[in-house]
Regions:
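Catalytic cores and motor modules of nucleic-acid processing enzymes
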Residues: 1-232
Length: 232
């Protein structure tokens, strides 16, 4: 129990789930949190399944341990979406899953068992609706687009670089408080919409205006030539 809360020592308001999620933006901290939560869940499972261990705690303590498990399981589900981590329930042993089913309804936790595809409008948008704040939704869009850019960048560098630049510009504006959380989210929805449609501000020759494969080839060649001859 104490080890789990120790992960969040720097946080002032430990009841603020948004502050906790922002703190978990660091991948190393997030990984530590996931591992510590799994250990805590297993320990709680042992207590609930042992008459002697159960008897060693007051009822209020058991309820506190249970509520902590529920609270951080919700956080875990949310940040895995927010930061585009691989969603995998394999670390939850059958006993752990049964325990969660006992104390948490389906509505309590975002249930996701398949990888999230941001190109599927209905699926991803439903997931976003479950996130608690405008910033968490915007962060999720940024993380998932960035992940896709990283995986596919070599296929069309110019195309993906254009979206990286738009995302970085929006992040900088948000960081400098030029954009509010709502404005940041609105801008990210615009980026997501263009990303899905393949719309960029990049100009192509008229003959390949409707040919995405030709545009990808053109983008690769153009980026090489622009870099070689230092063309702006």
């Amino acid at each position: 129990y104490s080890h789990l809360w120790d992960v969040f020592t720097p946080i002032k308001n430990k009841k603020d789930s948004e502050e906790i999620e922002v703190f978990l933006a660091d991948v190393d901290v997030r990984e530590k949190f996931y591992n510590t939560l799994c250990s805590y869940g297993r320990a709680f499972t042992m207590v609930m399944n042992s008459v002697q261990a159960f008897a060693a705690f007051e009822r209020q303590e058991i309820e506190m341990f249970r509520d902590t498990l529920i609270f951080f399981t919700k956080i875990r589900k949310s940040v895995k979406i927010r930061y585009a981590d691989t969603l995998d329930n394999s670390e939850y042993e059958p006993q752990m899953r049964n325990l969660l089913d006992t104390y948490m309804s389906v509505k309590d936790v975002i249930q996701i068992y398949e990888p999230i595809d941001i190109m599927k409008i209905g699926d991803f948008d439903k997931v976003l609706e479950k996130l608690p704040s405008d910033r968490s939704k915007a962060d999720a869009i940024v993380s998932h687009i960035t992940k896709r850019i990283t995986l596919n960048h070599d296929e069309n560098p110019a195309f993906y670089d254009s979206f990286s630049q738009r995302i970085n510009a929006a992040l900088e504006e948000f960081k400098n408080k030029v954009l509010s959380e709502r404005e940041f989210l609105k801008k990210m929805f615009g980026v997501l919409k263009d990303f899905r449609k393949g719309n960029t501000k990049q100009k192509f020759p008229e003959k390949i205006a409707g040919d995405l494969d030709a545009q990808a080839f053109y983008g690769v060649i153009a980026s090489i030539l622009f870099a070689k001859y230092k063309i702006e």
